[in-house]
Amino acid sequence: MAVTPWQTAFLQLLPSGLAWNKSPDSKLSALAQAISDVIATAADDARQMLRERFPSTSRWYLGEWESFLGLPDCTSENGTLSERQRAAANKMRMTGNLSRRFYEWLAAQYGFTVRLTDSTEGQWVTQVNIYGIKNYRNATVLDNVLTPLRVYESGALECLLEKYKPAHQIYKFVYHDGDN
């Protein structure tokens, strides 16, 4: 029978003498083994509780972290544990602002190339030029008359930018086939 570190520590705390048989095959050693298993589990739980302070290492309270950070959002649904931890850690570290560079950077973090420009439609309208999108389908006869001639599949990008934009701002999304 292998002697664990917690079992050894427990046996060393007991007094010496003939009444205290500390040999590995004694009943006292078996009792110390049972107690040390519980203490080892509690020590592991205490170490994990220290890791729960940060979303990148959280397992038990990851749901609470996600709720606090507003996750899952339109870009991070149904991920693995490590993907969810990474998304929560990135959201925790993110410091946003209202500049155009921030929105271009945010789109680049998700693999999109965009450029924001002023629109001629008014002060509160911004044109979001999206480059290099290859996920689209052409309209068919089964679509209704309100369907555009090309239907683009970048709903995650539009959802993401709409979530972080100021409430008074209107985004007009324009898709370009080539690079900028």
UniProtKB/Swiss-Prot annotation:
Component of the baseplate. Pfam families: Phage_Mu_Gp48 (PF10076). Its main location: virion. Disruption phenotype: No tail is synthesized. One of its GO terms (biological process) is viral tail assembly. The lineage of its organism: Viruses, Duplodnaviria, Heunggongvirae, Uroviricota, Caudoviricetes. It comes from Escherichia phage Mu (Bacteriophage Mu). Keywords: Host cytoplasm, Late protein, Viral baseplate protein, Viral release from host cell, Viral tail assembly, Viral tail protein, Virion. InterPro entries: Phage_Mu_Gp48. The keyword Zinc does not apply. The keyword Cell wall biogenesis/degradation does not apply. Part of a complex composed of three DNA circularization protein N, three baseplate hub protein gp44 and three sub-complex wedge (made of two copies of each baseplate protein gp46, gp47 and gp48) that forms the baseplate. It comes from the Viruses. One of its GO terms (cellular component) is host cell cytoplasm. Induction: Expressed in the late phase of the viral replicative cycle. Expression of late genes is activated by the viral late transcription activator C. This is Baseplate protein gp48. It is found in: Virion; Host cytoplasm.
